C-alpha cells in the first residue's frame, strides 16, 4: 500500500496588531489657513517572516503623505502586523497567501488607524480606497520574472 499525503490546508489568524504608528503635521498651524486641495500620495509595502513552523508574521506598511504645493500637510505611517498560522500551503500558493491574502486582511485595520490619526490631526476626513493586493502581487511576480530574464540575458552576453 502506498502512503498518501494527508496534509490538509489550514489558515488561521492568531493576532492582528499595530506594530508602529506615526503622524506628523510639520507645517501646522499654518497649513490650516490654506485652501484644502491636497495631493495625496499612498505608499504600500509588505514584509513577511516565519516565526515558527507554519506560523508567519506579515506586516503591511501604509504611508500617506498629503501635500499642499511644496509643503507637507501631514505624513502618516502605520505598520499593521498580523500573525497567521498557515499549514499545508507551499511554494507560490504560500507566497500568494503571505503577499496578497494576508495584506487584504490587514488593510482595513491600517486604513482605520490612518483615518483616526488624520481626524485627530483635525484634517478633513481621508477615505482610502480598497487596494487590490492580488493585482499588486501579480505585478510583483511579473517584475521578478522580467528581472530574472534580463539577468539571464545579461549573463549570456558577458
UniProtKB/Swiss-Prot annotation:
CDD domains the UniProt entry points to:
Translocase_SecB (cd00557)
Cellular component per GO, a single term: cytoplasm
InterPro entries in the record, alphabetically? SecB, SecB-like_sf
> What Gene Ontology terms for biological process does this UniProt record contain?
protein folding; protein tetramerization; protein transport
Keyword DNA repair assigned to the entry: answer is no
Q: What is its main location?
A: cytoplasm
Q: Which UniProt keywords apply?
A: Chaperone, Cytoplasm, Protein transport, Translocation, Transport
Protein location: Cytoplasm
Q: Which domain of life is it from?
A: Bacteria
Gene Ontology molecular functions? unfolded protein binding
SUPFAM superfamilies documented for this protein: SecB-like
Oligomer status and interactors: Homotetramer, a dimer of dimers. One homotetramer interacts with 1 SecA dimer.
Checking PANTHER family in the record gives:
PROTEIN-EXPORT PROTEIN SECB (PTHR36918:SF1), PTHR36918
User: What protein family does this chain belong to?
Assistant: Belongs to the SecB family.
Q: What does this protein do?
A: One of the proteins required for the normal export of preproteins out of the cell cytoplasm. It is a molecular chaperone that binds to a subset of precursor proteins, maintaining them in a translocation-competent state. It also specifically binds to its receptor SecA.
What is the name of this protein?
Protein-export protein SecB
Gene that encodes the chain: secB
Amino acid at each position: 500500500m502506498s502512503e498518501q499525503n494527508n496534509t490538509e490546508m489550514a489558515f488561521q489568524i492568531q493576532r492582528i496588531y499595530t506594530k508602529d504608528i506615526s503622524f506628523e503635521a510639520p507645517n501646522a498651524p499654518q497649513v490650516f489657513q490654506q485652501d484644502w486641495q491636497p495631493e495625496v500620495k499612498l505608499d504600500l509595502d509588505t514584509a513577511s517572516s516565519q516565526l515558527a513552523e507554519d506560523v508567519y508574521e506579515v506586516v503591511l506598511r501604509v504611508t500617506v503623505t498629503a501635500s499642499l504645493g511644496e509643503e507637507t500637510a501631514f505624513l502618516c505611517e502605520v505598520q499593521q502586523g498580523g500573525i497567521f498560522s498557515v499549514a499545508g500551503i507551499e511554494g507560490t500558493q504560500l507566497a500568494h497567501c503571505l503577499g496578497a491574502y494576508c495584506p487584504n486582511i490587514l488593510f482595513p485595520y491600517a486604513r482605520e488607524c490612518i483615518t483616526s490619526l488624520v481626524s485627530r490631526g483635525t484634517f478633513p476626513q481621508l477615505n482610502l480606497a480598497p487596494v487590490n493586493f492580488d493585482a499588486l502581487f501579480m505585478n510583483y511576480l511579473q517584475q521578478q520574472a522580467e528581472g530574472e530574464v534580463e539577468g539571464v540575458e545579461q549573463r549570456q552576453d558577458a
